[in-house]
Amino acid sequence: MAEYTHYFIQYNLTDIFYEDVNIEKYSCSICYESVYKKEIYQCKEIHWFCKTCWAESLFKKKECMICRCIVKSISELSRNRFIEQDFLNIKVNCPNSFKYIDENKNNNNKIKDLENGCKDIITIGEIEKHLKQCKFTHIKCKFIGCNKIIRLNQVEKHEKEQCEFRLEYCRYCDTDGITSRSLENHYKECPKFIVKCSENGCTVQLERSQLESHIEKQCQMVMIDCPYKIYGCEQSNRFPKSNLTQHLSSINHTLAMGSMIESQSLQIKETNIKYENLLNKINKLEQLETESKCDQLYDKFYQFESKIDKKLNNLQLDLYPKDNQQPQQKEQKEQKEQKEQQERIKFDDLFEKVSKVNSYFINGCLLKYKNRWSISNYLTESRKYRKITSPSFKIYDKKFKLVIYPQGKDDGSYTSLFLKSDSINPIKVFYKFVLLNFKDESKNLIFKNKSIMDKEKSVGCHYFIKSTEPGKKPEVWLKDDSLVIDFSIEVNINNDIKPLES
């Protein structure tokens, strides 16, 4: 059962008496409180008071407060259970017979709920037990957002039928947790809600999410224009899509069709011209970008070269003094040798920088490309196909791909690996293949070379690895049945290599 917050009505016993009762008859004559939940003691003269009042009186004076008979302690008094029990047997109404007034938290103004209140008549002694099981007690609705106070025997109806904050389930889209007050709005937007086609005359019912597609592609009642209207069709008014066949057969559209074909041909021609212009612009931009990069690298190279020449001249002046100068002292000679050593170090640094820049220039700009080729299900693929080709990739405007022959291109005992290009001109390439060893990285299989890709348009290694190795040692050369090859390529894009002819 769900946990509820209970709201109990605050009451005095006089509020719930079923019949008129003289409450003074059951009240302590010292504190004037009723004997409810109190122990009543009496002296030998039958003068009774509550235990609390007896204790306070005897603390001050050892005598009865009325007859003054000697009473040394409460233990000398007798319990008056008759008055206690007589009070507990008084008949009362259940406190839940009243309305719970939310605005009056203390319920000072008791209003009998004749229609929905508890009708039980009980005794004062039965009040606590009765309230624990009374079905008319007041509780707060369990749903978040609802602040209504209802009776326990009405909670099921309220939560299932009346509460606006009860959680509902959309039977169309399987969404739950929707409050009852929001369900109607949800139905107005639910993509799975069944709706009728909005086109006049169409009786199709379908999910809201399919409505747009239905109207666009399937609905026969949607109003359309003749497809040849802009090319001269006589029919100017729109008509249902279902009438299109009848319209096309009833009117001769030959002239309109000819006009349409001519118009579309012109559009295609204009599109092709725009495409060619855009392609030329792209090629020019790529060429300008490459030339700009090359110019920048050349500038750096000449700057470094100029610095080196200047340093060399300075060194030469210092190391070879003029003939008319006097011989230097020993100390000055040592200083000059030390200075020479420092200049040599600086020279070496500059030379190294120039070498790095110069590495970018081999008859033009050198572009570098690195990547990894992972061949899934290698053992299965190698038995199934003579060759396996990688996805193609571009370096500048040249397209390349890797091709592996698991059983060799020429010799079946060795696997072959090649780099191929679709370039129509010779290309100078520097390439490196690395077959990963998953047991020991230091034992990776490496092949590198530099070649000119001419008419063959492919370079590589015929004897890369024994064709049986991956199958014999899968734990070494395969990872999750994948053969992995790292490769790097350097391409000279501005070379003017021409094949020799004789």
Curated annotation (Swiss-Prot):
Coiled-coil positions: 261-295
GO cellular component: cytoplasm
Subcellular location: Cytoplasm
SUPFAM superfamilies in the record: RING/U-box (SSF57850), TRAF domain-like (SSF49599)
Pfam families xrefs: MATH_2, zf-TRAF
Zinc finger (RING-type): 28-68
Induction: Down-regulated by Pseudomonas aeruginosa, PAO1 strain and up-regulated by PA14 strain infection.
UniProt keywords, alphabetically: Coiled coil, Cytoplasm, Metal-binding, Repeat, Zinc, Zinc-finger
UniProt xrefs under InterPro entries: DNA-dir_DNA_pol_B_CS, MATH/TRAF_dom, TRAF-like, Znf_RING/FYVE/PHD, Znf_TRAF
PROSITE patterns: MATH, ZF_TRAF
GO molecular function ontology, one term from the record: zinc ion binding
Residue stretches making up the MATH domain: 368-489
Highest taxon of the lineage: Eukaryota
ZnF region ranges: TRAF-type: 129-183, 185-243
The family this protein is said to belong to: Belongs to the TNF receptor-associated factor family. A subfamily.
Chain's role: Probable adapter protein and signal transducer that links members of the tumor necrosis factor receptor family to different signaling pathways by association with the receptor cytoplasmic domain and kinases.
Domains (record comment): The MATH/TRAF domain binds to receptor cytoplasmic domains.
Family annotation (PANTHER family): RING FINGER PROTEIN DG17-RELATED, TNF RECEPTOR ASSOCIATED FACTOR
UniProt protein name: TNF receptor-associated factor family protein DDB_G0268444
Source species of the chain: Dictyostelium discoideum
Taxonomic classification: Eukaryota, Amoebozoa, Evosea, Eumycetozoa, Dictyostelia
